[in-house]
């Protein structure tokens, strides 16, 4: 059975568009094919989410941040269209140090930014990224990392965009900063296809709050 027909036989396009699809399994697909299907469907769905959801995400994180004085260096990301935008944290909590990723070949490094407008430039993948002249911050100095993704699960798995930048970056050390997946609630699934080497998030944050507050275990509680 062709890949597209297998999917359409199980879930209607209305279910996908409405955000009702929280956990689906398509038979006879490899993990790679299953991930590819999820990426496309999730991209379509997240484009419809209102900007107010990003504001709610920032609000929930600020509530947690005020309880965590040890989180001094925070890794953020510059969003693609349709992704949560958490960059307002720089103005909301200016006493912390914020770092952002810059792609270098097949890898990436994080740079300290103070002003996003003047200290970023157009980079690959349609993203803005820090200027190379901005100070580089080593992974060992990052206290907490907010990670983008196409989707996340309650089991804290992350479905990335497929390029593997975060996986390779985090594989540098076994001592990771606290990892928080950031997504919209309709892209938080019960389960996702995953592999043994996939790195788990410590928690997942949506406009409805931290997943750990809804019963999922987390080291951040």
What is each PLM-predicted segment?
Residues 3, 7-10, 21-140:
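N-terminal active-site beta-alpha-beta segment that forms phosphate/nucleotide-binding
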Residues 7, 11, 15, 21-33, ...:
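Surface-exposed, charge/polar-rich loops and edge strands
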Residues 77, 110, 125, 152, ...:
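Aromatic side chains
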Residues 77-79, 101, 147-148, 181-183:
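Short beta-strand segments
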Residues 80, 151, 210:
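Flexible, active-site-proximal loop/turn residues at the rims of small-molecule/cofactor binding pockets
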Residues 128, 148-151:
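A structured binding-face within diverse protein domains that lines the active/interaction site
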Residues 135, 158-159:
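Short capping loops/turns at secondary-structure boundaries
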Residues 162:
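Short polar/charged helix/loop
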């Amino acid at each position: 059975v062709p890949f597209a027909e297998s999917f359409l036989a199980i879930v209607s396009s209305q279910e996908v568009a409405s955000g009702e699809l929280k956990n689906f399994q398509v038979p006879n697909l490899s993990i790679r094919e299953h991930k590819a299907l999820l990426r496309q469907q999730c991209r379509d769905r997240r484009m419809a989410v209102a900007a107010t959801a990003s504001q709610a995400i920032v609000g929930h994180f600020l509530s947690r941040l005020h309880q965590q004085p040890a989180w001094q260096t925070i890794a953020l990301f510059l969003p693609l269209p349709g992704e949560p935008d958490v960059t307002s944290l720089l103005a909301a909590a200016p006493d912390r140090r914020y770092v952002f990723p810059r792609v270098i070949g097949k890898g990436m490094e994080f740079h300290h930014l103070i002003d996003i407008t003047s200290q970023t430039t157009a980079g690959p993948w349609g993203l803005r990224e820090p200027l190379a002249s901005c100070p580089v911050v080593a992974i060992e100095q990052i206290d907490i990392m907010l990670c983008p993704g196409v989707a996340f699960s309650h089991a804290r798995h992350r479905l990335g965009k497929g390029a593997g930048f975060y996986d390779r970056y985090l594989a540098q050390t076994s001592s990771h900063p606290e990892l928080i997946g950031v997504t919209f609630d309709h892209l938080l699934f019960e389960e996702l296809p995953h592999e043994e080497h996939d790195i788990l998030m410590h928690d997942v944050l949506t406009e409805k709050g931290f997943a750990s507050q809804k019963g999922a275990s987390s080291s951040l509680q």
